[in-house]
Amino acid sequence: MTTQHSPGLFRRLAHGSLVKQILAGLILGILLAWISKPAAEAVGLLGTLFVGALKAVAPILVLMLVMASIANHQHGQKTNIRPILFLYLLGTFSAALAAVIFSFAFPSTLHLSSSADDISPPSGIVEVMRGLVMSMVSNPIDALLKGNYIGILVWAIGLGFALRHGNETTKNLVNDMSNAVTFMVKLVIHFAPIGIFGLVSSTLATTGFSTLWGYAQLLVVLVGCMLLVALVVNPLLVWWKIRRNPFPLVLLCLRESGVYAFFTRSSAANIPVNMALCEKLNLDRDTYSVSIPLGATINMAGAAITITVLTLAAVNTLGIPVDLPTALLLSVVASLCACGASGVAGGSLLLIPLACNMFGISNDIAMQVVAVGFIIGVLQDSCETALNSSTDVLFTAAACQAEDDRLANSALRN
């Protein structure tokens, strides 16, 4: 007589959902960092390899997907890029506005004693926009090597339109190459639990969170504002678009995109994850192959919050009065700066001096604010990236679902 044994914990995890495997990796990473710091630092290599693999595959994935979708686009077939772009810009401005309200409700101050003399921020918003435009005319090989997604998008779109006039064999080859790269991406994503395990272990072992307690209130305002945008503002925008309960979609995007982005701390590395989620949601490939890399470049709600909150914290510290029109102008400036954050080395933090300049704050003090940003960066950057990246796929899904509903209603009326 044979007896049936219930599958063990390891077997259940191995054959369970990827989210459960990531949660297991997270818990094991925390335990290892608590038990042995040297061992935790050593397994950090696993996290570095995982993030490196995602960053390596993301540029070629964007190039091939966008090129294939445009080359094989059928005449008359509609994409939803325009409404998604509008949602990106509206979401970023709404986040900056929420950050202003949050900062007025819970004013924070800083200990401006750190220095950051070795960092060179852009001198003005014109320089930020110039860098963004110049990245469009980058050499394609250089764009792929450096992960310049604006340049990659421009070349992919141009080549895609050119290949529309090619023969079917060429189009099929491009499509097959796109599928091959997608397969490689899925392979890399399967190693996410191991990567998260390494990232969490090394972060807790090398950095810890003791330095963050000195900036507890500032972090509460920053993270609280990001949670407000993720769980209140974004759902309102999605409801406005799809006219039904937005929370199943919002929570799905936070769980399956935001969790990855929180630990990788890279919107570029999360592009393959978002692409896979869009495929899982059965969204239009012609749309998401363009909107996801575009969102990783310009959809920066988290960056807008960081710029606004830290700037107003500096303003409060120096006792500078701020009226309502100035606060609204700061929201606009923070939104524009956030959209250009991908074109600046150091991202949102190095755009803080631009916003500080509005209030006549000297560059020396502004750079001390940037230094504070780097101190709290362990948590701030993780939350910012999670919000930015999950919003890319959220707004893409909302626009695609709204278009599907419109077509279905139109078919019923006819």
From Swiss-Prot:
Q: Where in the cell is it found?
A: Cell inner membrane
- Write out the similarity annotation: Belongs to the dicarboxylate/amino acid:cation symporter (DAACS) (TC 2.A.23) family.
Q: Domain of life here?
A: Bacteria
The residue ranges for the Periplasmic side of the membrane come to 37-45, 105-142, 201-217, 321-331
Alphabetically, the GO molecular function entries are: neutral L-amino acid:sodium symporter activity
Name of the protein in question: Serine/threonine transporter SstT
Q: Name one GO biological process term.
A: threonine transport
Name the residues that span the membrane.
16-36, 46-66, 84-104, 143-163, 180-200, 218-238, 300-320, 332-352
> What InterPro entries does UniProt report for this protein, alphabetically?
Na-dicarboxylate_symporter, Na:dicarbo_symporter_sf, Ser_Thr_transp_SstT
PANTHER family named in the record:
PROTON/GLUTAMATE-ASPARTATE SYMPORTER, SERINE_THREONINE TRANSPORTER SSTT
A UniProt-annotated Pfam family: SDF
Lipid bilayer topology: Multi-pass membrane protein
Q: Which gene encodes it?
A: sstT
Q: Which residues lie on this side of the membrane: Cytoplasmic?
A: 2-15, 67-83, 164-179, 239-299, 353-414
Q: Which UniProt keywords apply?
A: Amino-acid transport, Cell inner membrane, Cell membrane, Membrane, Symport, Transmembrane, Transmembrane helix, Transport
Task: State the reactions this protein catalyses.
Answer: L-serine(in) + Na(+)(in) = L-serine(out) + Na(+)(out); L-threonine(in) + Na(+)(in) = L-threonine(out) + Na(+)(out)
Q: Name one GO cellular component term.
A: plasma membrane
- Asked if the Swiss-Prot or TrEMBL record annotates the protein with the keyword Cell inner membrane, the reply is yes
